[in-house]
Amino acid sequence: MSQRGNRKTQVGVVVSDKMDKTVVVRVSHLVKHPVYNKYIKRSVKYKAHDTDNSCKTGDRVLIVETRPLSKDKRWKVRQIIDRVE
């Protein structure tokens, strides 16, 4: 069995599930300001492929990098970590 190499993974929160088989995931991280040495919260939104339409808004998900699936989609949902009820 061949392995394709290490793919990037991110953990984020689903902020939109209105598209078919696509969710928008917000991934947050901390960045240190170079002058003031204060940590600032930054976030990036990724469109991720959700094959089964199983993700709902507010779910914490693990996304993995993949080949380009459309103009904006380069991530797939691997698993749902926490579900919102």
UniProtKB/Swiss-Prot annotation:
GO MF term list: rRNA binding; structural constituent of ribosome
A single Gene Ontology biological process assigned to it is: translation
Any one Pfam family match given in the protein's UniProt record, by short name: Ribosomal_S17
Q: Does the keyword DNA repair apply?
A: no
One GO cellular-component annotation of the UniProt record comes to: cytosolic small ribosomal subunit
Keywords, sorted A to Z = Ribonucleoprotein, Ribosomal protein, RNA-binding, rRNA-binding
Q: Does the keyword rRNA-binding apply?
A: yes
List the SUPFAM superfamilies: Nucleic acid-binding proteins
Give a short account of what the protein does: One of the primary rRNA binding proteins, it binds specifically to the 5'-end of 16S ribosomal RNA.
Family under the similarity heading: Belongs to the universal ribosomal protein uS17 family.
PANTHER family noted in UniProt? 40S RIBOSOMAL PROTEIN S11 FAMILY MEMBER, SMALL RIBOSOMAL SUBUNIT PROTEIN US17M
Subunit details: Part of the 30S ribosomal subunit.
Q: Which HAMAP family does the record associate with it?
A: Ribosomal_uS17_B
The protein here is known as Small ribosomal subunit protein uS17
Species source reads Geobacter sulfurreducens (strain ATCC 51573 / DSM 12127 / PCA)
Gene of this entry:
rpsQ
